[in-house]
Amino acid sequence: MSFLTTPPNEHTTLTSYLQLPHLLSLTWLAYPILSLIFVAFRLQASLASSEDAISSAKSNLLASCKAAEEAATSTASLPRYMAIATNQQVADAVNATLRGARAALILTLTVMEAIINFIIDLYRSIFLCFLELVVRGGIAILVGAVEEINNVLATVTSGLRTQIQASVGTLNNALRETIEGINRINPFGDIPVPTFDPPNLDGLDNVSLPDSFQESLLRLNDTIPTVSTIKEKLQDIIGTPFELVKRDINDTFAAVSFSADTLPVPEQNKVSFCSDLDLSVVDDVGNDIVKSAKIGIVILLVIALVLIGLNCLFTWYKWRCMQAHLEYTRQAWNTDPTMQTKGSISATPQIALSNHNLMVLQANSEHPLVTRITNQLSQKLRLSPRTHTHMQWFFNYIFHPPAAACLLIGVFGLLLIEIQLLAMGPLVNKYQEQAAETTKDFSLLIANSINESMLNQSTIYAAEINGRVDSVQTTINDGLFGWVDGTIVPLNTTINEFYDDIQNAVQTVFGGTILETAATEFIRCLIGSKVDAVENALTFLHENLRVDMPRVNDTALMLSPESVNEASAPIAAAAMGGGTDDDQGLIGRLVNSYADSLRKERVTFGIFLALWGVVVLMGLFVLFWHSTGKPLLEKRRRRKYEKSKGMLPEGGFVVPYRDGSAPPSRDEKNLGGGGNGGVGLAMTGDELPQFTPLPSPRRSAFKPFWNPAKPDASGEAKDVEKEPSPMAQVAADEVSKLKAFRLKLMGKSTESLDADSKASDNPPGLFGKVKGVFGKKDADQAPDYWTSYNASSDTVNANTARPNIRVIVDTDQDREDTYGNSFRHSADIEGADIYTPPPNSRWSTSPGPTKTSWNLKKLTLLSPKSSNNKKLPAVSGSSSIGPIPPSMSAAASGLKRQPSVPTDIGASFDDPFMASVSVPRKPSPIVPGIYPVPLHAAAPAINNNPYQRAPSPPKRFVAPYLNDPSALSRNTSGSSASKTHRRSSSHPAAVWRVTNAASTDRLTASPMSSQVSLPARMLTSENPFITPFDDEHRVEVVNPSRGEVRKSMAVNPFSNAAAVAI
C-alpha cells in the first residue's frame, strides 16, 4: 500500500481515529438518548391520539345529548299518548255515569212519587175514616134520640125507622165501596170492610118526629164528600209533576253524551337542553391528560439533555479508561519479562498479535465499562477464569449495541407508560365526583325540561276537558232539573190547596157545631205539620238539586318528581355515562381511550424488551452449551473413540519430555504416554484416528482474584482442547526451502516435521475448537505439552501462522539515556543458567519468554497503575524486572518527529511512516533469522554460545519464588546489583509488581518435534490467547509524579486521573 511506502505529503492535525472532542460531538447519538427520543415521539403520537379522543368524546357527548333530547322529547310527550288512550276511557266512564244517573233519577222520582202518594193516601184514609166515624156516630146518636122520640111518637118513628134502615144500608154500601177502592191502591194490605147493622127501630113505629128534624139529618148525609173523588184528585195533583220530571230526565240524558273523538289530545312538545350542556369537565380532563403527556415529554427531553451531559462525562470517562488500557498495554508489553528478544539487549521485543489477542483488545476497547465491571465482579466474587470469561462474554453479548437499544427502548417505554397508567387512577378519582355532579345537574336539567313540557300539555288538556265537563254539567242542570223552578212551586201550591180543601171539608162538616173547633185542630195537627215538612223538602230540592261534575286538574297528565327522575336518569346516564357499567361513565371512557392507546404502545415496547429477552435466552443457551453440553458431547465422543480403539498401539506418537517424579498426564495416558523415564511411547502417524484429541494449550493465566494455587495431589494435567490457528490447514508442501534449511541447521529432521504435520493433519472439529476456552476447570493444570513459540516461529509449521510484530515504546536516545549499560555486564553474572526456565510474566502476552538473570539484586517492573503517585517498594512475594529497550528510535532512523506526536509513536520499522526510512544503524543480525532464537537471551550463556544444545536432559526446575516468593527480593548471587531498566522517557519509570504469584505461572514443557533431536531442551509454555487486560488486577502500578516528567514529552492529560480512577 502507498501509505506504507511513502511518507505523507501534507501535514494534518486529524487522525485516522476519533479523538475525545470528536467523540463528545457524537454523544447525543447514544442509544439511551435515541431510545428516549423514540419514546418521546411515541408519547407524542399517543398525545395526538388522546387529543383526537378528547375531541371525539366531546362530539360523541353532543351526539348523545341530541339522542337524549329525542328520548326526553318522547318522555315529555307522554301526556299525548296518555290522553289518546285515556280519552276513550274518560268518554266511556262519563257516558256510563250519565246513564246510571238517569236511571237513578227516574227511580228516585218514582219512589218519591209513590211515597208521597202513600203518605197522602194514608192521611186521606185516616181522615175519611175519622170523618165517617164522626158522622156516622152523630147520626147514630140522632137515630137513637129519634127512636126514643119515636117511642113516644110511634107514628112518627115508624117512618123514621124505615128511612134510617135504608140509610144504614146505603152507608154500608158506600163504606164498602170506599174501602174496596182504598184496598185497590193500598200496598200495605186490605182494610176490612166494616158493616153497620141497621138499628132495631121497632119502637119508633109509633113515634114520629117532626119533619124538619128529619130533613136536617138527610141534608147532613148528603153533604159528606165521597172517597173516590178525593182519591182521583190527589193522584192527579201528585203524579203530574213527577211525570213531567221523568220526561225531562229522559229527554235530557238522551241528548247528553261524551265522545272520545271530540276530547282534546295534547300536541307533541320538543324538549331542548343541549344548549345548556356543561362540557367543562371534558375540557378539564382532556387538559390534564394533555398536560401530563406534555410533562412526560418535557421530562424525557430534560432526561435526554441530562443524559447527553452525562454521556459526555461517560464518554470522557471511557476515553480515560481507554487511555489507561492503552497505557496498560504499552507498559505491559514493554515490561514483560518473557518478551522475546533477538539475541541482543537492543533488539526489538516481539509479541504474538494473534486474532484472539486483537479481538480481546478490540472487545475491551469497545466495551471498557463492561470489562471493568466484569473484572470487579470477578475480583469480588472470586470467580474462576472460566466463569469470568463466560460472564464477560455474556455481558458483551446481551449488551451488544442493537440488543442494548432494544433493552433501553423497552425499559424506558414501559416505565413511562406504567407511570402514566398509574397516574390515570388519581386523575379519574379527581374528576369522578365532578362528573357525578355534572351528571346530576344534567339529570335535573332533563327532568325540568320534561316537567315544563308536560305541565304545558297537561294544562291545555285539563282546560279543554274541563270545558267539556262544564258543558255537560250545564246541560244536565238546566235540562234535567229545570222542572224544579216549574214544579216545586206548583207542587207546594198543590199541597197547600190539598190542606185547604181538607180544612174546608171539616169546616163544612163541623162548621157551626160543637165539633168544629176540635175537628179543625185535629186536621192541623194531623196534616198541617206534614204539609209543612213536604214544603221544606221541596224548597231544599229547589235550592240544592244541581249536578256538580268533577273537574280535571292542571297536573293530571304530569308525572311525579320521582317518576320524572326515574325516566331522566337513564337518559342522562346514556349521554354523560353513568359509571355503573364497564365504561365507568364519561370520565372512564375518556381516560380508558387514552389508556388503551398507552396499552397498545406498551405492546410495542414489550416487543422490544422481548427481543432483548430472546437475546438473553440465546446467550444463556450458548453458555449452557459451552459449559455443559459441549463438554458432555466431547466426553461421549472420546469415550466412544476409546471404546472403539481398545488398547492404543505403541510407537509413532512422541510424548513430550516429563520429569519421572511427576505422574503421567491424562494426554499421556490416553495416547500411550511414557513411563517415569520421560519419553513416552510413540504411535505412527498412519494409526492416528480422525478427531484425535490434541494436547491442550496452556490455559489463561488470568486470575483477577489470585490465590496461591495448590497443586493437584495427583499432579495430573486436565484435558483442554487447543483452538487451531487460522492457518491450521496449510499443506506441508508449502514449507519454504529456507525453513527446511533452518530445520537442518537446528539438527531437526524432516521426519520430526512430518510427525508434527501428521499429528496436526486431523484437527478437532468445529464443535471442539473452543473447548479449551470454555472447558470446565477441575483443578490446577499441570504443565501442558504444547509447541512453544520458539519452535513454532522457527519451524513455521502448518498449525502456526501468527504474525510477529515489533512494538517499540522507547526511543533510541531515551534508551541510551535511560538504560545505559544495564545489561552490559549481564554476562559477568555468576550462576546464570541458560537452561533454567525464567519466570512467566503475569501479562503472558508475548509469544516467547525472555531470559533474564534472577541473580540481580534488585529488579523493578513497570506498570501504569499508581496510587497517589507514590512509588511502591518491593514487597515479599512480588517480582520485578526492568523493561527491554527497543532497538532504535525515530531520531536514530532519520524520521522527523512532529511536535504533537509522542516519542513512542513512529519508532518501529513496522510503522507505516518508517517504511521509507533507510536501514537502521544497528540492524538485527541475520543469525537470529536463520537459527532458532533462544527463549531467554537477556543474559548470555557461560560459554557465550546462546544457541548450543545441552547434551543431557535438564534438571527439574523449581522456581525459587514458588516455594519462597521473597527470594526474588533477596540478593541470591552475591554479585553487585545491576542498574534497573528504566523507561525511555526522561521521567522515572513507573513500577509494576505482581502481587499474587502462583505456581502455574511457570509451566515447562518440551516440544514434541524436538524430543528426538533435542533430548534436553526446556521451553516455557505460554497461552497465545492471553492479553494484557486479562491480568489487569494482578498488577499494581506506580507512576512518577507529574513534576518529574520531561516538558518536551507529549503527556497524556488523563494519566493521573486514570490512575486514580482505576
Swiss-Prot record:
- Write the record's keywords in alphabetical order, separated by commas: Cell membrane, Conjugation, Glycoprotein, Membrane, Transmembrane, Transmembrane helix
**Where do the segments described as Disordered lie?**
652-675, 830-850, 960-991
One GO cellular component assignment for this chain's record is: plasma membrane
Glycosylation (residues)? 206, 221, 250, 451, 456, 492, 553
What kind of membrane protein is this, topologically? Multi-pass membrane protein
Give the source's domain of life in one word: Eukaryota
The segments annotated as topological domain Cytoplasmic are 42-102, 316-396, 626-1062
Give the record's GO biological process terms.
plasma membrane fusion involved in cytogamy
List all disulphide bridges recorded for this chain: none
Coiled coil, from the record = none
Regions that span the bilayer = 21-41, 103-123, 295-315, 397-419, 605-625
The residue spans the entry assigns to the Extracellular side of the membrane are as follows 1-20, 124-294, 420-604
Q: Where is the composition biased (Polar residues)?
A: 841-850
Location in the cell reads:
Cell membrane
Q: What is its main location?
A: membrane
**Database matches in PANTHER family:** PLASMA MEMBRANE FUSION PROTEIN PRM1
| Protein family (similarity comment) | Belongs to the PRM1 family.
Report the function annotation for this chain.
Involved in cell fusion during mating by stabilizing the plasma membrane fusion event.
- Protein name (record): Plasma membrane fusion protein PRM1
What taxonomic lineage is listed for the species of origin?
Eukaryota, Fungi, Dikarya, Basidiomycota, Agaricomycotina
Q: Which gene encodes it?
A: PRM1
